């Protein structure tokens, strides 16, 4: 059975991207909008294209993604992570170039929580001797 739709999930900080790849012409639709419409004029478009260019599949798949959580920058990174994982589903041969480019690794850095008795995560209240 040949699968014509590939699904993967990408994450970054609090952003979660659910990504579906279908054979097509390279359209990227995010939350039922074009990427330029959703992210605005200035966004990291090269990050979305990087997984495709790494695996020589540029403009061979259409991307339909739903994004939620986080900010726009984290959402772009989550989308790139999801696309990379979906490309891995399309062809296991894509693993080596994607891994060498560092696109399969989830960036686990998240905001550190505020601690009680302190002003922030690491910042302390100002100390007064008297």
UniProtKB/Swiss-Prot annotation:
Pfam families tied to this protein: Ribosomal_S9
Region named Disordered: 109-130
Organism lineage: Bacteria, Pseudomonadati, Thermodesulfobacteriota, Desulfobulbia, Desulfobulbales
UniProtKB keywords: Ribonucleoprotein, Ribosomal protein
Gene Ontology cellular component terms for the protein in this record: cytosolic small ribosomal subunit
GO biological process, one term: translation
InterPro entries: Ribosomal_Su5_D2-typ_SF, Ribosomal_uS9, Ribosomal_uS9_bac/plastid, Ribosomal_uS9_CS, Ribsml_uS5_D2-typ_fold_subgr
Keyword Ribonucleoprotein: yes
Protein family according to the UniProt entry: Belongs to the universal ribosomal protein uS9 family.
PROSITE patterns: RIBOSOMAL_S9
Protein name listed in UniProt: Small ribosomal subunit protein uS9
GO MF assignments: RNA binding; structural constituent of ribosome
